[in-house]
Amino acid sequence: MAIKIYRPTSPGRRHHSVSSFEEITKSRPEKALLVSVKNDSGRNNQGRVTVRHRGGGSKTQIRVIDFKRNKLDVPGRIAAIEYDPNRTARIALVFYTDGEKRYILAPSDLKIGDVIMAGENAEPKSGNALPLSAIPTGTFIHNIELIKGRGGIMVRSAGAAAQLMAKEGDYALVRLPSGEMRKVRSDCSATVGQIGNIEHGTLEIGKAGRNRHLGWRPTVRGSAMSPNNHPHGGGECRSPIGMTGPKTPWGKPALGYRTRKAKYSDKLIVKRRG
């Protein structure tokens, strides 16, 4: 992927960069693999805001992605690399030999015409999905399952890759992109390779309108609000927040206060991120 930079014809263009989309080979998605979902604008089923700063944006259709990779021992040919407006990674359209079509996350070195397969007997090459027990130590992987058969939930964004560090008994040790070292059951599957669109992290938004197209609304400072909307609100003009430390909109300590809840699976984390 290459980054396209514009001439500074306006303040928004000056710091504006986009993907060249040179790896995209098909402009229209596969109709049978599309699902329409109503934009909820960050609201739950009661209409209350559960995620702030969401709303608007361009209409999109959901591409049904095969995160489970449960079509075992059936070869599939890569027919196209496509853009997906709902994620940062590119997706690949796979034609299986039995006639079925599916979308998968596209690894960086996947090309049209490549043959991929899922299963314990698959070769550990880019795009193939195998149990962690069948993947050589040191291999870069993505789309990692935490519970066997439920589909990959970790390492799915553009340019991401985890590394299989070791295997011991029923567990494999995986280093995640955040630096966290975590044990995962060795019968859980993962896909070999690094996810494509590697330079996505270097893109510059450039202007507020582009974020609105992506469905992101403005973020207002708490000190600019009234006191009934935020702990930092109120006062005359540029007043200090009036407390010893910053607070969230719900009155909890912000910036450095640990909010991660304890989970049963925390015992599988060998080393925290950072």
UniProtKB/Swiss-Prot annotation:
SUPFAM superfamilies reported in the protein's UniProt record: Nucleic acid-binding proteins, Translation proteins SH3-like domain
Gene3D superfamilies hit by this protein: 2.30.30.30, Nucleic acid-binding proteins, Ribosomal protein L2, domain 3
Region entry Disordered, spans: 1-23, 222-242
InterPro entries to which the protein is assigned, alphabetical: NA-bd_OB-fold, Rib_uL2_dom2, Ribosomal_uL2, Ribosomal_uL2_bac/org-type, Ribosomal_uL2_C, Ribosomal_uL2_dom3, Ribosomal_uL2_RNA-bd_dom, Translation_prot_SH3-like_sf
One Gene Ontology MF term: transferase activity
Pfam family, any one: Ribosomal_L2_C
GO annotation, biological process: cytoplasmic translation
Superkingdom assignment: Bacteria
Record note on quaternary structure: Part of the 50S ribosomal subunit. Forms a bridge to the 30S subunit in the 70S ribosome.
Stated role: One of the primary rRNA binding proteins. Required for association of the 30S and 50S subunits to form the 70S ribosome, for tRNA binding and peptide bond formation. It has been suggested to have peptidyltransferase activity; this is somewhat controversial. Makes several contacts with the 16S rRNA in the 70S ribosome.
Designated name of the protein: Large ribosomal subunit protein uL2
Species this chain originates from: Dehalococcoides mccartyi (strain ATCC BAA-2266 / KCTC 15142 / 195) (Dehalococcoides ethenogenes (strain 195))
